[in-house]
């Protein structure tokens, strides 16, 4: 009789552990996932696209585009102006944020870039959205509301 109780107790514990491990360890599904802001801000709409392979983020693109599709980090005049005033520019800070996501595989330890902290906040929200999409295997574009 005691062996039966011990077996049932161990089986119950094992089943509980399985349920906990399944709910906490969501794996990302292979594919490309994109999130973009819901609106343009100063003429630009920021977006993040990641590529996931074997539960790892293997590439990250973070940028912004205008209504005609022109990419912000390609705007040399904007770069010169921003670099003079802020000490950084889109092609620099977008790569910094993207490389931090690649290294950490999450947004927990993303360091803000001086002069681009607003974009850093947007990046974290966009990256969290694409990671959630990757966990669900949902390749539709996530739309993230612009913070006021």
Positions of PLM-derived features:
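Bacterial N-terminal signal peptides that target proteins for export
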Residues: 1-10
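Active-site- and interface-proximal helix/loop "cap" or "latch" segments in soluble metabolic
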Residues: 25-148
């Amino acid at each position: 009789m005691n062996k039966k109780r011990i077996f049932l107790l161990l089986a119950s514990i094992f089943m509980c552990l399985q349920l906990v491990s399944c709910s906490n360890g969501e794996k990302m599904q292979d594919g490309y996932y994109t999130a973009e802001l819901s609106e343009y801000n100063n003429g630009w709409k920021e977006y993040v696209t990641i590529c996931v392979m074997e539960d790892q983020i293997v590439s990250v693109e973070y940028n912004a585009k205008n209504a005609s599709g022109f990419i912000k980090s390609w705007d040399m005049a904007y770069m010169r102006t921003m670099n003079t005033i802020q000490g950084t520019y889109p092609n620099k800070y977008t790569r910094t944020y993207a490389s931090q996501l690649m290294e950490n595989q999450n947004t927990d330890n993303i360091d803000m870039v001086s002069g681009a902290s607003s974009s850093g906040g947007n990046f974290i929200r966009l990256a969290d959205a694409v990671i959630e999409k990757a966990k669900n295997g949902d390749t539709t574009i996530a739309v993230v509301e612009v913070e006021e």
